Amino acid sequence: ESYLNYGEISAVLLEVDEVLERYHPEDIFILSPYKAQIKAIERFISLKAGLNDFELRLESPATNEGLLKFLETWLGKENIPEFYKDMGSLLEKISYVRSFLADKFYMKGIYNLGKKRLSLSDIQAIRFTVDTVDSIQGQENKVVIISFVRSNRKKNVGFLNGFDGLQRINVALSRAKKELVLIWNPPTV
């Protein structure tokens, strides 16, 4: 079973914006022990870059396709034709997507991806290393952002409780050369 935590995704995006003021995207690892969290972070980073493309008038088939995939995922395929029929201009649609994200997922930092306003092609060319803890063993990077995901009153961190979990945490914590950012719920972890 894989878990998601939208509050932590929002925090990751805000941290990425901060880190991009000092580092290049290739200097960043974004890690989580949960694949669902990693996939969602990748989607939201790509969406933010795609929204930059729209604002910078860099629309491309890849940007349009990425936005459509995102909308299909979160609005449902059956609602897409109505969405396009009812909305006016493309910028109104983008504005709607932003307010939808802010309301549904608490994504207040969805407006751009860093002050550098990276485009979707920048992100696809450079690619943040957004991956699970297991996949980066033996690798290091200047900045590591870790989203632990689990948040509950029972202090249940799932598989991270066991010996293997402690080893995974140790691997994740030791990958940063310069900056380590931990995103977690302190009462849980």
Labelled PLM ranges:
Residues 184-189:
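Short beta-alpha junction loops
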